[in-house]
């Protein structure tokens, strides 16, 4: 009888990126994937996590903001999480195993490039820096962080600051 062999499947986080045509030459897909990946890993997200990133314009994000938040104005970033339950404690230590061929789709982060550009100018830093910040912010929302209350806002800001330090070399 042949010896028993264990097969270990190593998965990686799947990050899907769509950059709308007017912004394709302005934003690097590998840059976005690195930022998202480092943020997810720093938060100990499940290695089977999957997320989508969309870079779009003012009109599309304004339409989404109106449809889903009731605000008839553009915004910088929107996060749409896809999990049925609040993803607050979604980490690699979760008791429920995910089959090796299934990813946990956290959701979508949608960023307005023109809004990021405006905010970068106002803050006197690069558009890449602003996009990284907005992406981190969006990913943290998908992981259950929020900023509607003072304490929660402080916690989220702390995680954003830590993530920005982790990606500093990517921005240079």
Swiss-Prot record:
Its main location: cytoplasm. One of its GO terms (biological process) is rRNA processing. Keywords: Cytoplasm, Endonuclease, Hydrolase, Metal-binding, Nuclease, Ribosome biogenesis, rRNA processing, Zinc. It is an enzyme of class 3 (hydrolase). Pfam families: YbeY. GO terms for cellular component: cytoplasm. Its cofactor is Zn(2+). It is found in: Cytoplasm. The keyword Glycoprotein does not apply. Zn(2+) binds at residues 137, 141, 147. GO terms for molecular function: metalloendopeptidase activity; RNA endonuclease activity; zinc ion binding. The keyword Amino-acid biosynthesis does not apply. PANTHER family: ENDORIBONUCLEASE YBEY, CHLOROPLASTIC. Single strand-specific metallo-endoribonuclease involved in late-stage 70S ribosome quality control and in maturation of the 3' terminus of the 16S rRNA. This is Endoribonuclease YbeY. It comes from Dehalococcoides mccartyi (strain ATCC BAA-2266 / KCTC 15142 / 195).
